Amino acid sequence: MAATLTVQDHLVHFYHLHALDWVSPVEALAADPIATANLQNTVLNTYKLPFRAPGASVTEAYEHDFPAATPQYFNEIKEKVKAIVESGQLGIFSANWWDHPDYKLLPPEVHLMAVAHYLEMLDKQRELVTPHVIFGGKNPHPHYVVGGMPCAISLEDGNAPVNTARLSIVDRAINMGRSLANNYYLPDLLAI
């Protein structure tokens, strides 16, 4: 639970609380989707720093969560952001100074890549906290099991709070956290 909280906390703080201090959805509109796809591949090849867990804790044959790196994907994101900006109601992108000159320090393709990952992490962060739900915790301040207050575990009973199916969900969340840190967070942090 603590590890998934740490990864989720870093993702939320980077993408949702700090990224828009450095990247702009308005600047992303000037990006070329083909150049952005090439940039995404370059960033992954250059900045991927594999976070490795002990071998016994790796339970998936391969990583499942990679950033999309196709021109079609980035064109879809660009069109989505364009519709939001042109509507004049920026919603999640409101209350910023998009005309500030420092937003021009990064190329538009970095802005588009980062905004795409910002949007992806809105969904991914929800999945990362499922271990908190399964073990009866909450976020961002999980309840840890106090002595004398056991959590019912049964690998056979489908109604037990912790069972085989729920443990596989926890395992998936842990592996997802590792993939997101390796393939999104660390490369984006170094690129931006």
Name each model feature, range by range.
Residues M1-I192:
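Active-site bordering "gate/hinge" segments
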